[in-house]
Amino acid sequence: MGIRFGVQEEHSFAANLAWAEKQAAVQVKSAANALEASQHVLSYLEALWSIEKDHLHIAVDVSSFPRTSLVAIYSAIWASARASRPISVSFLYSFAQFTEPPIDHGPITEFGAVSPEFSGIGEADFGLATLIGLGYESELALAAQQVMDPALTWLAVPQSLDVRFDDAVRKANDLLINIVDERNVWSFPVDDPYSTFVELEMISHGLQRTHNVVLVPLGPKLLVVACLLVSSIHRNVGVWRVSPGGLREPREQLAAGPVAYISAIFSGTH
């Protein structure tokens, strides 16, 4: 199933849509928002359950999803899973060719939990610890740090297959990197999402003993998935977003070739 969101349908979208509609095995569904996308996924999964009674294995390509829709689709899969009918999910990400950072990311219009179920559960006597993923959007990362004003700040710096991307991200976020304790600047491998998840879970597990923890996954989409997985395990850990919403100017992205993925089993609890 492919989901069409009806916004920012520019650049190579028409060619991609034409290809998908020619594939007999692909159902193209239109979704006006993240809720409709999640409803399409729930219906799709229920149809699969009518065929496979015990266990599903699905793949979700997160490369082009808006983050709000990614969260909604993740939640829909979680809602469909049961202990008696688990769902194995592989989240895939196709790396894009390097492009220079955009000059303007647009004004910030959205800030808060990615959805109510990922808002986190705070302890009244704990301070706030925030882990912010870094990407090209340096002003969004700075805004998250300044608005949340945490007692402790961690930064997640992506290490990609292209050193030009790494250099551009560090250059864009130089101010924030320099004001955060270097011991709290964590580099994670974009091409190894399982290791990223394991390390993120360890960091979050340690922080939650003394702090209310909020993860803000700017940067690569697989970091969003890792944060959602961690929050699904540690329900007191929140996942928040800061975004210009639909005001960001769309850009053409070409696949570089490599694909990374992380797999998890959803059973209605974790």
Please report, for each region that a protein language model flagged, where it lies by residue.
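Active-site glycine-rich loop that binds ribose-phosphate moieties when present
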Residues: 105-125, 134-142
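Short internal beta-strands
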Residues: 1-8, 90-93, 152-163, 241
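An N-terminal, globular interaction/scaffold subdomain
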Residues: 1-47
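Redox- and metal-dependent alpha/beta enzyme cores, enriched for Fe-S-associated oxidoreductases
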Residues: 134-203
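A short, acidic, amphipathic alpha-helical segment used as a generic capping/interface helix at domain edges
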Residues: 45-49, 192-211, 223-231
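Active-site histidine-anchored catalytic micro-motif
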Residues: 65-70, 85-116
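Short, flexible loop segments at boundaries between secondary-structure elements
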Residues: 85-102, 235-267
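Gly/Ser/Thr-rich loops at beta-strand to alpha-helix junctions
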Residues: 6-10, 34-39, 61-72, 95-99, ...
